[in-house]
Amino acid sequence: MQLVFASNNKNKILEIQSMLPESIKILSLSDIGCHEDIPETANTIEGNAILKANYVTQKYGYDCFADDTGLEVEVLNGQPGVFSARYAGEQRNDNDNMDKLLTELDDKTNRNAQFKTVICLNINNKQHLFTGIAKGNIVKNKIGNQGFGYDPIFQPEGYQYTFAQISLEEKANISHRGKATRALIDFFKN
């Protein structure tokens, strides 16, 4: 089965493809000729996932799934949240985003945070949502060089290392995206 993943983010595509059964082949947006930016104008993570999946299904006619992920920091009332990718500006620079967040948390003792991923699957004219959450905290300095996004500053609950210090396989077992993707996989098994 071929399924479009409404993304051109190579890191996300690799992470999700590594978790799916071999019988499901992921096509990226560029694989189907979609080169435009898909609007992410919703004010929730769920809303952005739905917008992206609906865009591909309606404009290109493919069954597809889309995800949106946000880092929600407790003391910042859930920010950066839906703005996580462009927290420090529209250029979407991971280091700038982390630096801005670390500066905002510099004098804070409460560094509790969670990553939230929502996957919206449009298949056979039906829509399904799958959510994954990874609780943890924001460390004071960037640690590790694996992963992407906020991985170097997010320490999952119960662990002594950041997401950027572990392998893709280990991260998939405990991450927000891993949990949401396993829910998606379970859907296909049933």
Swiss-Prot record:
Q: What is its EC number?
A: 3.6.1.66
Q: Name one GO cellular component term.
A: cytosol
Q: How is the cofactor bound?
A: Binds 1 Mg(2+) ion per subunit.
Q: Which UniProt keywords apply?
A: Hydrolase, Magnesium, Metal-binding, Nucleotide metabolism, Nucleotide-binding
Q: A Pfam family this protein belongs to?
A: Ham1p_like
Checking SUPFAM superfamilies in the record gives:
ITPase-like (SSF52972)
Residues that hold substrate according to the record: 7-12, 69, 148-151, 171, 176-177
Segment forming the signal sequence: none
Record-stated family: Belongs to the HAM1 NTPase family.
The protein depicted here goes by the name: dITP/XTP pyrophosphatase
In its UniProt entry, the species of origin is given as Flavobacterium psychrophilum (strain ATCC 49511 / DSM 21280 / CIP 103535 / JIP02/86)
